[in-house]
Each structure stands twice: as C-alpha cells, then as structure tokens.
Amino acid sequence: MKEPILVMMAAGMGSRYGGLKQLDPVGPDGEVILDYSLYDAYQAGFRRVVFLIKHEIEDAFKAMVGSRVPAGMEANYAFQQLDKLPEGFSVPEGRVKPWGTGHAVLCCREFLDAPFLVINADDYYGAGAFKLAYEYLRTLRGKRGEYFMVGYALKNTLTENGYVSRGVCTVNEFGFLKEVRERTHIIASCDGPLFTEDGEMYRRLPDDTTVSMNCWGFTPDFLDALAEGFVPFLNEAMENNPMKAEYYLPTAVSRQLDRHRATARVLTCPDRWYGVTYHEDRAVVAKAMLCKAEES
C-alpha cells in the first residue's frame, strides 16, 4: 500500500506580516518553521512530501529547503498557477490573487495517490499533531469519504500582537466535525479570548474552544469533490467577485459534510500552535524553536 503523503502549502505571502514567511529563519542555526515541521513529520513516519509553491519562488525555495529534506523522504514540487482552471474558464483580466487553498490542493493532484495531510508551511503544529495525523492516515488506506482535522484549543493559538482569524469548530458527541465557523477578529485579553463581529461589541469565547488551524487529512477521493465544487465556485466568482474570490478548503469540506458524502473526525492536539501573523510574533516563535532544539 502507498504511504501517507504530507502536503505543505508554501505558495502564500503574508498579507499583514509581509515578505516570504516560509523562508524567514527562526531557529538558532537558521532553520525555518518548515524545517521543524519536516523533522517532526519524518519522526512521525511520513516518507513522502509535496511542496505547493509558486513558480516565482521556486529557485529560492529549493535552494533553502530542498536540500534539507530528511534523507529517505521523497520530495515533489507542485505549483499553484492562476491559469490552472477547468475547461471553459479563463483568468479575469487584472486578477493576480491565487484562487485559494482548495485550488492549491487541486494543483497537487498528480502526486496524491494515497491518504494525505495538508498543512500550512509557515505554521508550526507540534510533534503531536504529526503523530496523530500519521497514525490516523494509516487507517484510511482504501477508504473513501473519511476526512479528519487536527484541532487546537483556542488559547493555544493566539498572539499578543493583534487580532487573528480562526475557524471555530462545532464537534458532535461522537467526535465528528459538524461545522467550522470563521471568526475573523479574535483577540487575547486578560479575561480570555474575545471576538467581535462589528469592531465594537466583544464577546467571550472559552479557552478550550476547538479551532481549525488548517491541518486537514483526506482520502484521495476528496480530490474529485474538490474539482466538482470548483466549477460552481468559479461560476459565482466570475459574476460577483472576479478579482478576489477564493475557493477555501474548509468550504469544500463543509459542502461534502452537508451533503452527507463524507465525515470529518476531529483529532485534538494538546500542543501549542505557533505562527507568524505579525512581525512581532517572530521572536515568540524563535524562542519556542530554541527550546525545542535544546530539548532534542
């Protein structure tokens, strides 16, 4: 049987932080976040990785990261291209924004012939997340319509440096995902996490609220569902928001769940999540990575 695959989404540029986050060193010896994720993934059992990047960063990315892929780990590169669209569609004049995370995974399709995990390359999920994911992926061989999400406690994902957007999850009594609701303005406070919808009135969220940090696992048939949903998305996007509409991975998952075509197990990770949303977050991540290096 083919081994589980790790997909690392490295095509994005941080809109608020600025710059190519994936290649910004945070470790004591110049390591980037992606290096730590690769190490943890390898230790968990992953032996295949697909990097999703843009053609524009290919040389810089391969020079910095390609040579640091663990020995014994097969690496492939896929490219998120704006004009990689279904027959009958073309890129609207003036559009430069990528089509979103759902489209990004579709761009990796040629390499995804086994259950796979999708993560952001500029986020650090913790060793526990990769162990949970790898073991669960191994149970999905030959199955269809069985997805999962690695969830985190909201308190373990916040920054002191500004507001964040988080997918707040509703989980049923059997541990399956019912809904992901995007909260676009959550802040950390002395009273705990607070969110606002209008910028004026803030409401409390429990510390242990399960949130999605875009760490998803899928059986290969999900790619058919992604492709199927991309067409109606494009039809609507071309009419209503041709410059900025994005096809999000959670939207495609919700579509499958709503139609009872799939289930999504929620695997709870106790680790802290680290990411660089704001420039000031880099120091926090660097400190955490130094501690990790000293422990290992």
What is the predicted role of each segment?
Residues A227-R261:
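A C-terminal functional module that forms or caps the active site or interfaces directly
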Residues A114-Y124:
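Short beta-strand-to-loop acidic/aromatic patch adjacent to the donor-nucleotide binding site
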Residues V69-P115:
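Short phosphate-binding loop-to-helix
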Residues C215-A227:
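Conserved nucleotide-sugar donor-binding
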Residues G14, Y124-G126:
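A short, conserved beta-strand element in the Rossmann-like catalytic core
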Residues K2-G66, A75, Q80, A114:
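N-terminal glycine-rich phosphate-binding loop and ensuing alpha1 helix
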Residues A127-M213, P220:
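Conserved core of the sugar-phosphate nucleotidyltransferase
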